[in-house]
Design a protein with these regions (language model features):
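Flexible, glycine/proline-enriched loop segments at strand-loop-helix junctions
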Residues: 42-43, 69-79, 104-109
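Surface-exposed amphipathic alpha-helices with a cationic face
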Residues: 85-92, 153
Length: 176
């Protein structure tokens, strides 16, 4: 994985290896018709679920231009959730572009209410929000793309890209 990142011009200087906890994995179904693919995952108890505020506070964000966050780490553990918040807060404070893809994984959360609360709260820290249309229904309460985009604009997102499978994507810029 590290070599593939390097081969694609992605910096690996912030990668760490955990000698105790395993690497989580996710598999994703290949689909041709545009429906949401099945994506079984094995992440509970993984190294990522042990991510902590200490590691986030130790990061030098000085040369980072973009922080991309998904909704998976905050689902893994309370500790990883706190670390996710801290990363987004630090990035915003440092005026680093923050992108957020909710990546709903209900089976990883304690319950649906907690999932909605946390993911909608994390969207407050994002400059760009990238939900799927199904995620909009669950998180914003609508499949109307304009209304869903407005929901995220009200949280502060300058740009919302709503993914809609074979129908492409709906892009909305916040009007000043």
């Amino acid at each position: 994985i590290e070599q593939a990142l390097k081969d694609n011009g992605i910096g690996t200087n912030l990668l760490t290896y955990d000698p105790v906890y395993r690497t989580g994995i996710q598999l994703k179904e290949y689909v041709k018709d545009g429906h949401d693919p099945a994506a079984p995952y094995y992440r509970k108890g993984s190294a990522a679920s042990h991510l902590s505020i200490r590691e986030i506070d130790a990061l030098d964000l000085g040369e980072i231009g973009l922080v991309h966050v998904t909704g998976i780490p905050p689902a893994l553990s309370k500790e990883a959730r706190e670390a996710t918040y801290r990363l987004m807060e630090r990035a915003r404070k440092a005026q680093i572009l923050v992108t957020f893809d909710p990546n709903l994984r209900p089976a990883l959360w304690e319950n649906d209410e907690m999932m909605r609360k946390v993911l909608n709260d994390l969207a407050n820290y994002a400059d760009v929000v990238l939900p799927g249309i199904g995620e909009c229904e669950i998180l914003a309460g609508t499949t109307d793309k304009e209304k869903a985009a407005d929901f995220y604009h009200q949280k502060g997102a300058a740009l919302v890209v709503i993914k809609d499978g074979k129908n492409g994507a709906y892009v909305s810029e916040k009007k000043e």
